[in-house]
Amino acid sequence: MVKKFAFIQPLICDGNLTPPLGTLIMSAIIEKEGWDVHFFDERFNINAVNSLIDFQPNMVGISAVTASILRGRDLADQIKRALPETIIVLGGPHPTAMPEEVSVWNSIDFVVVGEGEYTIKDLCDWYLSGREPSALQKIPNLCYTFNGKFIQNKNRAFLSSSELDILPRPAYHLLNIEEVFKEMTHGLFQKGKRILPVMFSRGCPSQCTFCCRVMGYQIRYRNTEMIMNEIESLVRDYNLDEVWFEDDNFTANPKRAHEILDSLIELNLGVYIK
């Protein structure tokens, strides 16, 4: 059976254009399961959805924040009209905060809330094993509408530090990397620099009312040596100018933050750290 999975990043006009770390980790997980995975990004290619339709995937993942959720819905509608048999999955901060509201959209088959790495893998396994509706109930962090009723499965526990350590590295090879480096922008760095994000930890103990808290209150840290190996590989493979820590709260534990920074000083890679 042909196994094609496509992720698409909706256009968003907030001035920040950076690779989606979570989506690229999910891409790597699905690739390991033998799927042909493609990543399309409207922010860098305005014709991304047409390229996705030409790819004719079995399943599509769309990740959206509030600022891009309506465009995400438009993309789902366009894809479903062209490929009615394709399964469309919506995830990201906005669907996590409001799963019932988005699950009723006609073009959305499933909503993934919270950390999606293993939920999306379970959903791919379900797709290949006969697509029995009753089997969906066993997939944590999954929401959907069945016979007109909204169903939200139990939540999966947040990934532990040891589980974060065994996640594959982001599938940066799926990007048109030179185009990304050329066009990538963010308030933290200068356009045109060769920059990639790295994850040191997930979660934040603060309880700010404006935050959607997708990753939870408890911080889980990755192994320092593994992070150093990843950064060293990224700098070497992509000739980076800078590395950007995309953590919820990098300095929540000053001791761990100093450990990372001291290790980077020892590596002496000659890149900026942000």
Predicted stretch roles:
Residues 8, 63, 114, 145, ...:
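Conserved residues at the C-terminal ends of beta-strands
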Residues 156-177:
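Conserved ATP/PPi-binding loop(s) of AMP-dependent carboxylate-activating enzymes
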Residues 170-274:
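Radical SAM [4Fe-4S] cluster-binding motif and immediate context
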Residues 3-14:
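Nucleotide-activated donor-dependent transferases that construct or modify glycoconjugates
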Residues 4, 22, 26-161:
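Glycine-rich beta-alpha loop elements in corrinoid/cobalamin-binding modules
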Residues 12-21, 64-69, 194:
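A short, glycine/small-residue-rich beta-strand->loop->alpha-helix junction that serves as a flexible
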Residues 18-25, 226:
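Conserved alpha-helical elements of sugar-nucleotide-dependent glycosyltransferases
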Residues 14, 67-68, 94-95, 218-219, ...:
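Glycine-/small-residue-rich active-site loops that bind phosphorylated ligands and cofactors
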